[in-house]
C-alpha cells in the first residue's frame, strides 16, 4: 500500500490488473499479447500501439500508387507482421480510400489480408491514401473482464459498491 507518490525507474511488471483512480498520463501506450498465430504463440508476442475509442479497433493505413487503375496491398507485409496475423487479429473490417491525385472515383475492399483498391478509370496512376479498421478479435480481448462475450468493450460498467 503506497500513500503519496511512487516513483519507478526502469520497468514495472504487474501480473494482474492495474486500476488508476484519477488521471493517467503516458508518453505512449500499447498492448503486448501472445501472438495469435498458433505457430508463433509460444515464441513471439504481438505489439500494437493504442488509439483510444469506444471499440477496441486496430488501424492500418498507408498510401499506394495505382497501376492501370488498381493496387493490391498485403496488410501483413505493410504492418511487418507474419502472414496470417491480420486475419487472426481482426473482425468486422472496414476500408476507406481517398484519391489524392485527381477526381477519379476509387474503392477498396479487403479479403483475407489483401486490400484491393480499384479506380473507375482503368488507366489511373493516382496516389491513393487508404485506411483499414478492424475490431480486435484475439483471445486476450475475449478473456478480459471489460468486454462483452462478443469482444466489444463494456462502455458503461456498473460501479463496484464497497460494503463497510
Residue ranges and their predicted role:
Residues 7, 13, 17-164:
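Extracellular receptor-binding modules and their adjoining Ser/Thr/Gly/Asp/Asn-rich linkers
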Amino acid at each position: 500500500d503506497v500513500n503519496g507518490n511512487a516513483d519507478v525507474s526502469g520497468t514495472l511488471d504487474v501480473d494482474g490488473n492495474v486500476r488508476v483512480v484519477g488521471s493517467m498520463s503516458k508518453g505512449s501506450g500499447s498492448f503486448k499479447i501472445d501472438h495469435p498465430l498458433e505457430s508463433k504463440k509460444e515464441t513471439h508476442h504481438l505489439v500494437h500501439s493504442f488509439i483510444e475509442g469506444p471499440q477496441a479497433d486496430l488501424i492500418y493505413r498507408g498510401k499506394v500508387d495505382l497501376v492501370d487503375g488498381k493496387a493490391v496491398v498485403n496488410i501483413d507485409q505493410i504492418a511487418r507482421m507474419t502472414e496470417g496475423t491480420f486475419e487472426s487479429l481482426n473482425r468486422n473490417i472496414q476500408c476507406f480510400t481517398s484519391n489524392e491525385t485527381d477526381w477519379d472515383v476509387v474503392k477498396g475492399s479487403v479479403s483475407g489480408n489483401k486490400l484491393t483498391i480499384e479506380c473507375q478509370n482503368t488507366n489511373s496512376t493516382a496516389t491513393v491514401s487508404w485506411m483499414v479498421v478492424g475490431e480486435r478479435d484475439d483471445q486476450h480481448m475475449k478473456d478480459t473482464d471489460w468486454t462483452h462475450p462478443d469482444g466489444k468493450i463494456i462502455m458503461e460498467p456498473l460501479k463496484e459498491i464497497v460494503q463497510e
